[in-house]
UniProtKB/Swiss-Prot annotation:
Subunit structure, interactors included: F-type ATPases have 2 components, CF(1) - the catalytic core - and CF(0) - the membrane proton channel. CF(1) has five subunits: alpha(3), beta(3), gamma(1), delta(1), epsilon(1). CF(0) has three main subunits: a(1), b(2) and c(9-12). The alpha and beta chains form an alternating ring which encloses part of the gamma chain. CF(1) is attached to CF(0) by a central stalk formed by the gamma and epsilon chains, while a peripheral stalk is formed by the delta and b chains.
Main location: membrane
Name of protein: ATP synthase subunit a
A biological process term (GO) from this entry: proton motive force-driven plasma membrane ATP synthesis
Gene: atpB
Annotated GO CC locations: plasma membrane; proton-transporting ATP synthase complex
Length: 271
């Protein structure tokens, strides 16, 4: 619920501010007067990303250690269904041989899903605690609604794309792919390099921006509902949107995983 001292515009702006650290002074940034500098990091996004990543590791490791050959419990069954689903997706889409792809796909799917799931928390819950209990000037709890997080993950995928291209084709083969496709003639090398370069770079950019755009829009809708409507009427829109958003957060995690598998499969193909 919006604060009585805030206008709807102030409320919306407040919830779109990250908790930032100025690396030059190692002090928290005032959201009302942010410095015009590159040397800031969104420590709330980093914190929740790391915590959710650790949560994924702890949950899956605990299930793996307690797994039995008998009748599994409900939680173990759910984990096994997720693992089976991801493993099946990898087998269907990745045709190379690599022990990294399936664990990577599982990590991406669950990690992105957990980050997206933070969007279903009450919009004022953690920011209120951060402001009134911890004295923090701002807090955003959805890491995947931060373009820095999604593009950083996409950058990691891009590095793997380059690695698998060079590993499977060699530096010479990868260079030929960039310079002699689609026009197999030396005179078209500059044109080929531009076309293939744009195609290669567009993969991580679109991968990161797609996730960011969908999650930012979802977060913004929750904020608009909370900031513009009276508290007693918010549930009329919040509940249907939250139910629909469950599909969105799952779908976006799946899409990020699938595109990663597809891109790495393409990079692993020998020509």
């Amino acid at each position: 619920m919006a604060s009585e001292n805030m206008t709807p515009q102030d409320y919306i702006g407040h919830h779109l501010n990250n908790l930032q650290l100025d690396l030059r002074t190692f002090s928290l940034v005032d959201p009302q007067n942010p410095p015009a500098t590159f040397w800031t990091i969104n420590i709330d996004s980093m914190f929740f990303s790391v915590v959710l990543g650790l949560l994924f590791l702890v949950l899956f490791r605990s299930v793996a250690k307690k797994a039995t050959s008998g009748v599994p419990g409900k939680f173990q069954t759910a984990i096994e269904l997720v693992i089976g689903f991801v493993n099946g997706s990898v087998k269907d889409m990745y045709h190379g041989k690599s022990k990294l792809i399936a664990p990577l796909a599982l990590t991406i799917f669950v990690w992105v899903f957990l980050m997206n799931l933070m969007d279903l928390l009450p919009i004022d819950l953690l920011p209120y605690i951060a402001e009134h209990v911890l004295g923090l000037p701002a807090l955003r709890v959805v890491p995947s609604a931060d373009v820095n997080v999604t593009l950083s993950m996409a950058l990691g995928v891009f590095i793997l794309i380059l690695f698998y291209n060079i590993k499977m084709k060699g530096i010479g083969g990868f260079t030929k792919e960039l310079t002699l496709q689609p026009f197999n003639h030396w005179a078209f090398i500059p044109v080929n390099l531009i076309l293939e370069g744009v195609s290669l770079l567009s993969k991580p950019v679109s991968l990161g921006l797609r996730l960011f755009g969908n999650m930012y829009a979802g977060e913004l809708i929750f904020i608009l509902i909370a900031g513009l409507l009276p508290w007693w009427s918010q549930w009329i829109l919040n509940v249907p949107w939250a139910i629909f958003h469950i599909l969105i957060i799952t779908l976006q995690a799946f899409i990020f995983m699938v595109l990663t598998i597809v891109y790495l499969s393409m990079a692993s193909e020998e020509h």
